[in-house]
Amino acid sequence: MGETTAFVLLLVATLTRSSEIPADDTVGLLTEPQVAMFCGKLNMHINVQNGKWESDPSGTKSCLNTKEGILQYCQEVYPELQITNVVEANQPVSIQNWCKKGRKQCRSHTHIVVPYRCLVGEFVSDALLVPDKCKFLHQERMNQCESHLHWHTVAKESCGDRSMNLHDYGMLLPCGIDRFRGVKFVCCPAETEQETDSSEVEGEESDVWWGGADPEYSENSPPTPSRATYVAGDAFERDENGDGDEDEEDDEDVDPTDEQESDERTANVAMTTTTTTTTESVEEVVRAVCWAQAESGPCRAMLERWYFNPKKRRCVPFLFGGCGGNRNNFESEEYCLAVCSSSLPTVAPSPPDAVDQYFEAPGDDNEHADFRKAKESLEAKHRERMSQVMREWEEAERQAKNLPRADKKAVIQHFQEKVEALEQEAAGERQQLVETHMARVEALLNSRRRLTLENYLGALQANPPRARQVLSLLKKYVRAEQKDRQHTLKHYEHVRTVDPKKAAQIRPQVLTHLRVIDERMNQSLALLYKVPSVASEIQNQIYPAAGSDCKDPVEHCVCPQVDGLVSYGNDALMPDQAYSSAPMDMGVDGLGSIDQSFNQANTENHVEPVDARPIPDRGLPTRPVSSLKLEEMPEVRTETDKRQSAGYEVYHQKLVFFADDVGSNKGAIIGLMVGGVVIATVIVITLVMLRKKQYTSIHHGVIEVDAAVTPEERHLARMQQNGYENPTYKFFEQMQN
């Protein structure tokens, strides 16, 4: 009983609540009120009771140029509705039988226009359907009050940023006549849009109607064929004067039955118009508007307006007469660009240039050729950008001739900053390209060196080892090390030329890397003398193997010493090292030290002769080669790798190496010192002479001055002290003599 009472009370409260809700003006309307305009034709409005488009009741009203005028016209043709605002529709519509002024009934081919929706009562945002795999988004800007087309562009670009297509959208927060502060929209993937479009083609009855629902709609009803195509064709065939309308006499011969059937078909076409517009149809309308020629109109007003010029790909000012014309007519350049920038033909994405391909592809044996190609492409792209900026600069200066001097300076400063930004961007891209190239070259060199070293060690471990194979692999290994050294030195020379500060920073890493190369070669060569039979056979060919590639053309660079333990002597580039220079015993089977057979002549850097035979404290095996086992060799390689990782591998991915001056010239230093001493002596003598001359004064004797003399006599005495002689006195003295 209690549950029944509660249910009755709830039902009464619901009915009471529903009776308090005011009735909406649009209740009972078949479709939403809309108006459409086409310059040169009578305005059209849709009949909200039957969904058909009808001409202007007065037969005089044509296209309007202001939003206020459109709102007023909506209020005139729909006096029974409370029209409060207007907004452009999301989709174009096809309207038939559009009459010229002065003709109330006519039959002409179809015109496609974007109508204006007449909003009734308080603004209510459109409800949007969100299909599967689609996203609902919205944007609000409370400090902006923009048009419908502006927010359509915002929604389209937002979907494009997500690699999706705009499916549907609606305005938010009205702030004026056809002005809003936001937009809500639905973005769908491209494949979803294609499925939606295909389903629309298969059956138009599945679309959403304008405003209310069709009372005769059912899922089993056959699709209503569109009359637009063949009506347009028939009308065009009957158009003899080519003005787009049928001739006058055709209106008089129209059969009432045919006219009634035509009205029914027209109603069906209007009823099948949907709100789920595709982006392509909107783009077609925007393109038709923005690519039209600018028209001043018949009136003689002088209004400054903007129209879009597709050839120049920008908006251009023109003078509008105040009436007529077309829709390629905008109040500001910003509004013009916001609407028409999307109508430009989208350029197909160009294939990736050589720079992008270089960064995407891994390094291979064609590294140098790929790098050269990428560098040329980068320079060509930079020149093209600079040429474009220079052309824009010339155009801006030509347009700024009549501007004030401050504006001219602002234009010049703007383009100077633009050029500087392009230069900085190009420099950064070059630096990135060079660093990538150097890292890849270093990786290739490391790979080749590691491979040749493994092959060389494998040949030494062979049983029995073959001398010719060992020599060949030794040459390849030494060549790989020399390429690494040359690469390091050349790169350092480049860095020192371009950026001396960076060269000073990476100098310690350069020295460490060069030292590691020498230590690696020393240890690898020391292993050769653990195989006396091979060493004795190829000792005369060791020098060509190690020294043939040691003719480094890099200026101021000294070829590496491949003796047992390299000493850099008095080289100013190298830090002080405590290298052992004590002579050691002769090697196995009377072999001399490696510096006698390997060393290259070096007159500037003294190298003490040392024996390359490994000693026990170096951690190398000293047993005969017959007892040298395969599992003992990695110990040497491990030590080498440790030295390498400690001295070089830490930096090779980020640092680039090039050599500084390796040799020192004592004669030049002594000459500079002597010259400096001579110059200093000359300067000191000159200063002493000048100072002595400064204190020299003229004295012609001592004149005793009485303290009681007058000021005139005292002044005369001072003058005489400085060499003054009274000519009168001198004359009388000469007369007396």
UniProtKB/Swiss-Prot annotation:
GO terms for cellular component: cell surface; early endosome; Golgi apparatus; Golgi-associated vesicle; membrane raft; plasma membrane; recycling endosome. Residues 690-737 are cytoplasmic. It is a single-pass type I membrane protein. Residues 193-280 are annotated as: Disordered. Residues 286-344 form the BPTI/Kunitz inhibitor domain. Residues 354-545 form the E2 domain. CDD domains: Kunitz_ABPP-like. Residues 1-18 form the signal peptide. Cu cation binds at residues 148, 152, 169. Glycans are attached at residue 522. Residues 19-668 are extracellular. The chain crosses the membrane at residues 669-689. Disulfide bonds join 39-63, 74-118, 99-106, 134-188, 145-175, 159-187, 290-340, 299-323, 315-336. Keywords: Amyloid, Copper, Disulfide bond, Glycoprotein, Membrane, Metal-binding, Protease inhibitor, Serine protease inhibitor, Signal, Transmembrane, Transmembrane helix. Residues 29-190 form the E1 domain. It is found in: Membrane. Residues 29-124 are annotated as: GFLD subdomain. SUPFAM superfamilies: A heparin-binding domain, Amyloid beta a4 protein copper binding domain (domain 2), BPTI-like, CAPPD, an extracellular domain of amyloid beta A4 protein. Belongs to the APP family. Functional neuronal receptor which couples to intracellular signaling pathway through the GTP-binding protein G(O). This is Amyloid-beta A4 protein. The gene is app.
